[in-house]
């Protein structure tokens, strides 16, 4: 199958090897991009683990050399048992005394799978400091993404689910303790194995390994961004038609996930930007052909090949950041508009309730006089011809007067723009006719005295105000 399998001394018939190799080539080149292929393989693996039937197979094209954390020669052939498939993708439990990693040699062959090293021995063998191990050690805690150069020995990479050490002749990929990341890490190892086996040309080994890591990271960022755009975009489109409580709750959940993705993308972009701005780190990343960095030289060394590679992925990551930021702004704008609509509806309900209260108060006051009139007491108007009419008219006038005065007070404290029946804004007229109407008694009864009188300051007061503004002389 591959050299890595022969290194593990697994006896497989040559015909089976040829069939597997041809199938792998067809499987690798039938996809348009790495993202589509990874999504298809992830889907197959998920269906395999969750399907109730026993006919599920390992997705074609996945290297057995990295899927199985505990190799057994008799189990290299794909099996139909879904439990065995799950065990092959089982993550590694963190240990305080050991580190677990898979090693690729300079030809792309896997020389060790999930091999455990004592931490102190591992640090001494790779000329690392204990603080460096925190960035790459197997842990369930997410660490800030980083690419640290330890010239001239290695490059420490910690991006998303990938924690690796790149040397001039080998790559060490550390295992994960998170079950959901184990599958992603397996797909990355498959990509790394394929790319390291391809002809290198003039590209250094460490740059090919670093580019494989960046490709994997960008592919997963792109897939996550696509999911966020589809999910949030659908909810935003639905909220334009109807404001629903469940939709707002879903938008809140997706907004939190989008913010987390945005933060990760920004951190990765900052890592690439720091590398591009630091010539010393760029020089230290040349492990195969070391370059000595001298800051005193006026014309620094040209890192065109490395800068072009990093800049291309920096622009791609920056594009993801911009799209995610734009989507976050759309969500915030939608939230603000929804809040404005809800506040307007709430104020409309409060205004409607106040109007009902005003009318209720008017009718209550109007029935006060008839209540006195209807008492079984002598009021000296029982025999009057106009008594009933006078009481009725006076009660109605009294109720209308209370309603008018109440609406007058309500208009003074009302802050919203009132709408008339036709949907037009009610603006106060500034024409001469409107000013003349304001002087009428019934206009002042409904709307109050709108004329605000200001007394002009005296010359002495004007002088004091002028001195206060200019602060030229102390006040006397």
From Swiss-Prot:
Organelle targeting peptide span: 1-20
Motif (YGMN): 373-376
Gene Ontology cellular component annotations, sorted alphabetically: mitochondrial inner membrane
Alphabetical list of InterPro entries matching this protein: MRS2-like
Single GO term (MF): magnesium ion transmembrane transporter activity
Coiled coil: none
Main location, first listed in the record: mitochondrion
GO BP: mitochondrial magnesium ion transmembrane transport
Membrane topology: Multi-pass membrane protein
Subcellular locations according to the entry: Mitochondrion inner membrane
Pfam families, alphabetized: MRS2-like (PF22099)
Record keywords, A-Z: Ion transport, Magnesium, Membrane, Mitochondrion, Mitochondrion inner membrane, Transit peptide, Transmembrane, Transmembrane helix, Transport
Bilayer-crossing regions: 349-369, 385-405
Family: Belongs to the CorA metal ion transporter (MIT) (TC 1.A.35) family.
Subunit structure comment from the entry: Homopentamer. Forms homooligomers. Interacts with MFM1.
PANTHER family: MAGNESIUM TRANSPORTER MRS2, MITOCHONDRIAL, RNA SPLICING PROTEIN MRS2, MITOCHONDRIAL
Function in brief: High-conductance magnesium-selective channel that mediates the influx of magnesium into the mitochondrial matrix. Essential for the splicing of mRNA group II introns in mitochondria by affecting mitochondrial magnesium concentrations, which are critical for group II intron splicing. It also suppresses a variety of mitochondrial intron mutations and its absence may disturb the assembly of mitochondrial membrane complexes.
Stated name of the protein: Mitochondrial inner membrane magnesium transporter MRS2
Gene source species: Debaryomyces hansenii (strain ATCC 36239 / CBS 767 / BCRC 21394 / JCM 1990 / NBRC 0083 / IGC 2968) (Yeast)
Lineage: Eukaryota, Fungi, Dikarya, Ascomycota, Saccharomycotina
